[in-house]
Amino acid sequence: MAMNRASFPKDLEEGLNAHFGMEYREYPEEYSKVFDTFSSDKAWEEDVLMTGFGPAPIKGEGEAFAEDEGRQGWTARYNHVTVGMKFAITQEALEDNLYMQVGARYARALARSVKETVEVMSANILNRAFNASYTGGDGKELLATNHPLLFGGTFSNELATPADLSESSLEDIFIQIRTAVDDRNLPIALKPKRLVIPPQLVYEAARLLRSVQRPGTDYNDINAIKALGVIGEDVQVVTRLTDSDAWFVKTDAMDGLKFFDRVGLQRGMDEDFNTGNALYKVRRRFSVGWSDPRALYGSAGS
């Protein structure tokens, strides 16, 4: 149904001072600080696990060389979705409004709505990171204690015992990252890159990462996390995280958390020939998810 003059009665008469409630300052883009962003020109994108070789065994004199083989494993698929919205407004509502460019203002609101959906869908990857109903290519949720290794065994990117964000829990997750292995169970030099938290943990994160001495103690010990430069002070607050206790550490694993832009923000405007109504629409096409779960470690909190 088209918006009409009855939708904006106060805009048809003198005496109105201001409009409020539609436009506020917005937080900077958050999803691109958590997900590595790529463009796409295909109907979907796929990443497939590839493995190398295990440790080379000792070869005895005159004996044949041992043989090994690499192989492909599971596949992660990114299926693009289209999000969009439209509105219509009558000619008369546009002509008789005394105070604002209604079409332009609501067109900005459309773009904001699409932006919100992008942020929410991206944040939901983390919101569902501990939920076994949402699995990746290896059949496990994003954060799990038993991700399968292709040649046998498992690895964990979740604290075995859920814990709130603290000095000890952060150190435990850094140790897990430091001892990470690939699918042939070979050590990999994985490094913490960014602490990702909900708004409720921003002050605790500042104390943990920026204090010169150990936070929350009377001892004269150094803050080992800061002194060693394990992660620096790079913190990303994700406004749309729904669990106030959950926290995450993004690593530098390649091909991990990914966002594919198939079609960037598109705006359209037309006029309905029969009614004269102005028609506005906006759309975006994208996908978001993960390939290698080693890109994220964390805990759901206690």
What are these regions (language model features)?
Residues R128-G152:
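Structured all-alpha helical bundle cores of eukaryotic regulatory proteins
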Residues M1-Y27:
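N-terminal alpha-helical "arm" segments
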Residues T75-S133, L195, Y280-V282:
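Long, contiguous amphipathic alpha-helices that act as assembly "spine/axial" helices in icosahedral shell
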Residues R25-V83:
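Assembly/oligomerization interface modules of large self-assembling protein complexes
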Residues T75, R184-N185:
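A generic local secondary-structure boundary/capping motif
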Residues N79, P187-A189:
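Solvent-exposed alpha-helices and their adjacent loops that cap or buttress functional pockets
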Residues H19, R71-Q72, A180, L265:
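Short alpha-helical segments and helix-capping/turn motifs at coil-helix boundaries
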Residues A2-K10, L143-D182, A189-R194, Q200-S302:
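Sequence/fold signature of self-assembling virion shell proteins
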